């Protein structure tokens, strides 16, 4: 059995998957915030419960926000303070007497989608998250590409390309990002960026769901806004696709629930790609809230 943990600032979620990649059991507990020992205990107790329930010693994979293992072997995860700065993988491997694998939550999202029954035919899968921020992951032949510092797939911290500034205007604001840089694309393409763009052009502070509702009602202002957003997304994604050249792009995050994105994006991409490039298949993520657990469990699928 494959045990997948999706760990965040408020909850530890465990999903148990069989050899057919089907979810057999899941359980959630609160994430301890102040005690590393309590954090380790919470994970180990869930593993023990799963081992007993299924009569086996399952493999353990963990998805967690941040950098799973820095050069000194410690975790960097600002949203999980009890474990940040600790040698989490080594400590859990020792306590559980098995190989525990860690990766960041965006890679686990991408891995979950790459192992969808229909999507396994594609060698290179790119996950793109359009949510509170913009991120994602790359999966090649069923395994995540992490990079030296686990920042592969941090697409949101690419800067606006020159074509975007030409389209939006050279006086377009280069917003300061939480990473300390200016002009990172997640400030314009995330759910918050979607709302910011609307306010910037129309001086109305609406949230993304409100704007989308107006779009669905045929509101001309909202429709013009969505056209502008999709054009900007296509410009930025075109740069990424020129570097990565994936077979499949799977879009997740809150904005993936807006059908216009997956329905209209592909037609806008060719003008931003090399003439010989082929537009990849673009799909909405299929596994929702279970994706983090699925992807973490599947860290053990290919060795």
Swiss-Prot record:
Binding site for Zn(2+): 157, 177, 179, 184
Enzyme class: transferase
Coiled-coil ranges (or none): none
Binding positions for ATP per the UniProt entry: 4-11, 133-140
Name of the gene: nagK
Keyword Transferase included in the entry's annotation: yes
Primary role: Catalyzes the phosphorylation of N-acetyl-D-glucosamine (GlcNAc) derived from cell-wall degradation, yielding GlcNAc-6-P.
Family to which the UniProt record says this protein belongs: Belongs to the ROK (NagC/XylR) family. NagK subfamily.
Keyword Zinc belongs to the record: yes
Database matches in SUPFAM superfamilies: Actin-like ATPase domain (SSF53067)
Record's protein name: N-acetyl-D-glucosamine kinase
